[in-house]
Amino acid sequence: MPDQTPAPSVLRFVDRHIGPDDQAVETLLNTIGVPSLDELAAKALPDVILDRLSTDGVAPGLEHLPAAATEHEALAELRALAQSNTVAVSMIGQGYYDTLTPPVLRRNIIENPAWYTAYTPYQPEISQGRLEALLNFQTMVTDLTGLEVANASMLDEGTAAAEAMTLMHRAVRGPATRLAVDADVYPQTAAILATRAEPLGIEIVTADLRQGLPDGDFFGVIVQLPGASGVVHDWSALVEQAHERGALVAVGADLLAATMITPPGEIGADVAFGTTQRFGVPMGFGGPHAGYLAVHSKHARQLPGRLVGVSVDADGSRAYRLALQTREQHIRRDKATSNICTAQVLLAVLAAMYASYHGPDGLRGIAQRVHGHARALAAGLADAGVEVVHDSFFDTVLAHVPGRADEVRAAAKERGINVWAVDADHVSVACDEATTAEHVADVLAAFGAAPSGADFAGPAVATRTSEFLTHPAFSDYRTETSMMRYLRSLADKDIALDRSMIPLGSCTMKLNAAAEMEAITWAEFGRQHPFAPASDTPGLRRLIADLQSWLTGITGYDEISLQPNAGSQGEYAGLLAIQAYHHARGDSGRTVCLIPSSAHGTNAASAAMVGMKVVVVACRANGDVDLDDLRAKVTEHADRLSALMITYPSTHGVYEHDIADICAAVHDAGGQVYVDGANLNALVGLARPGRFGGDVSHLNLHKTFCIPHGGGGPGVGPVAVRAHLAPYLPGHPLAAELSDDHTVSAAPYGSASILPITWAYIRMMGAAGLRSATLVAIASANYIARRLDEYYPVLYTGENGMVAHECILDLRGITKATGVTVDDVAKRLADYGFHAPTMSFPVAGTLMVEPTESESLSEIDAFCDAMIAIRAEIDRVGSGEWPVDDNPLRGAPHTAESLLVEEWTHPYTREQAAYPLGKGFRPKVWPPVRRIDGAYGDRNLVCSCPPVEAFA
């Protein structure tokens, strides 16, 4: 019989996760002026949406959650789920390959909080380590593809293909609306292209492009190299033909193959896209993996997502920063190149360091071994009289076995190997870095063949003659000692959660507990192919089912898809579902999307991607949606109204008390309500968007549910819906249990291998713990608002003077009076050892602060002390004691080197620069560079590793 004895409090995970203890919570409440956390919730949230606890003290929607487990209990349950999976030898291919992650990279990147707890490098002076790693990634991609500029990762190969399509469409600027797609692209890529193309009015023409480009006008062409069938085809003639007819060409290129075969750029391709998964990143049942997108430099400004560039700091030293940010959704909104926000930075770093560790010779050697196994397989098949369909291939052999495909697949399965049955007559077998001669022999036996002593008669594919990865970054770290120290040196340049709170509003930088992270490196989860037989993955499927049940209860929705692999993709999938619902009802004219002026730019960019027209709704002076303006615009667009996108609590950091009336106004006009779940950390256990008016929401598992941000990804953005939208959730052509329509990610369940993090968090917190986390997050934000309001006015509060889980500090008056900017304050915080809050969003000239429930009272107080000390420095500028152009704020951040000059000419002391609150305040953070010149970096765009001479 199981042990029913309650766990001692010392083992309760909730007390490890939530920073303030009971005494600290009392201090928070006393400062705020409320007697209890429940009273705080009653004052902050509208009564109409606030869920009441049941008689047994459980919040509605959370009663189905199991009782909170200890860390050891949760890990034991996860281990049991993992052990129910079968780790077969995967030779399926189709874009996913087994790989050998070097232990030095697993230990020092994937398992290192200095890397996985960092945020997107918007504060470049304290992000130089991961920016350098991302520059290595971009250099790796450009070298291997033969193109000139690559971005700092995409979500996966399929979405990279879709972005390549829209990039070419923008770049051509002609009347053509047709895209030619080769029939031999991966099925999942073709499905994502179809989903993305339809609302944009793009017609996809699928054909065997080895026979040439079909008649008619095209803006672009997409081919795969090698193809899904494994064939290596010379596409140079097609590229020339496409260019003659005014079309651009994008190649889905395998980067390992590109070490041997002629790369896309050298055959004239304009764009290359793909995945870096086989560079040390586990398959993970589909993700997460870092996709890539590379172009010629003339198309650099058309690239979506993050782009790292080289600039200079205030002393003229080389420094890295995010370049050309005006392309991105947070600035250009519905005119952005993409809605991509979070990408796959952690996996991009892993792939880049895999390339650095192996170097060009090592990568070429791995590729040659993979190709050698494939040739040995083909030779054995040919000797046995089995037809090898293509004689030119890299790693994948396609065998023609009339009527025997299922028989061969079953025979391979009996030997512990999964192969790919293309149809009843063809079997595809893919070799990879983990393939051995024994695996080849076993597969041959499944065909009724045996290894051959002869080489395969097909042509050689090793046609690449150009060098690659010649920068010292890919040759200097070939020993484990040097790589370990390199990774440590990079991490030491950054501020992540292992060094400081990261109070970024709208980002929810909470604890990513070690127990939550532990399972993601287990082989039973990591070495699963997304298209493996369902019988191999019962544990993963049970985990996914648990999450679907738990998350729908928490949010009040009826169904959920875990496929979207970022919040941006969740938004996109949710809006697609709304449009599909309208179309199914004959309301195809409903294309207007109402979006408040305070919304995150991703909302508008996502609406544009599904063909909606964005109409902006005004906000009142207190930050709430202007209900009169909303009603007027609902009336004006009633017959064409598709949806309202609204973030709740609002992007202004308050619970709008009109939310029920807002939703009702849209519903009365036949529209749907999209409740952006970015701020769900302020709702869990208190209110459910699916019950107060939402028809659909996306969740950010990398915010509310503890998946780490990884320096800019991975993320997971599940989309949850009410029942009437459920038929339009994302499907997948290669998952029998899903429909074939509305595919938004390359894998059926997106970034499945990091779902154990969220599973563990919910399992260990339980219903009461989740609700407590929300309440403490709200209390901590209100405490900061109370402590700092007299120094920096809090811009918005709710009807009872409360904020939600974040607060906006208004510096506009300070800037007008003193000349000190929000940028000055953000940079100065680094001298105090803190990462800055979110700058100038959603209101220019402000700081948005979100402490989360995980930060202790002492850490919150230290942040407040730093902000108060900075206000005193501002006052010295305002009084004229320090010039506006020469003071510790304008000079921030201060490097050690900048203080070691022989003659100090500033009106403030070196001690004031480096230790403004004394040497005992907190561990010193030394920024590696001074303030970076952003304009210089955009004017002189360099997006690959600069030559060594540049640092001389």
Curated annotation (Swiss-Prot):
Q: Which GO terms describe its cellular component?
A: cytosol; glycine cleavage complex
Would the keyword Oxidoreductase turn up in this protein's UniProt record? yes
Required co-factors: pyridoxal 5'-phosphate
Q: Does the keyword Oxidoreductase apply?
A: yes
Q: Which UniProt keywords apply?
A: Oxidoreductase, Pyridoxal phosphate
Q: Which reaction does it catalyse?
A: N(6)-[(R)-lipoyl]-L-lysyl-[glycine-cleavage complex H protein] + glycine + H(+) = N(6)-[(R)-S(8)-aminomethyldihydrolipoyl]-L-lysyl-[glycine-cleavage complex H protein] + CO2
Q: Which CDD domains match?
A: GDC-P (cd00613)
Q: Which residues carry this modification: N6-(pyridoxal phosphate)lysine?
A: 703
Annotated GO biological processes are: glycine decarboxylation via glycine cleavage system
Any one Pfam family here would be: GcvP2_C
What EC number(s) is this enzyme filed under? 1.4.4.2
Superkingdom of source = Bacteria
Q: Which InterPro entries match?
A: GcvP, GDC-P_C, GDC-P_N, GDC_P, PyrdxlP-dep_Trfase, PyrdxlP-dep_Trfase_major, PyrdxlP-dep_Trfase_small
Top EC class of this enzyme: oxidoreductase
A GO molecular-function annotation: pyridoxal phosphate binding
Give the protein's biological function.
The glycine cleavage system catalyzes the degradation of glycine. The P protein binds the alpha-amino group of glycine through its pyridoxal phosphate cofactor; CO(2) is released and the remaining methylamine moiety is then transferred to the lipoamide cofactor of the H protein.
The family annotation for this protein states:
Belongs to the GcvP family.
SUBUNIT field: The glycine cleavage system is composed of four proteins: P, T, L and H.
Mind telling me what this protein is named? Glycine dehydrogenase (decarboxylating)
Q: Which gene encodes it?
A: gcvP
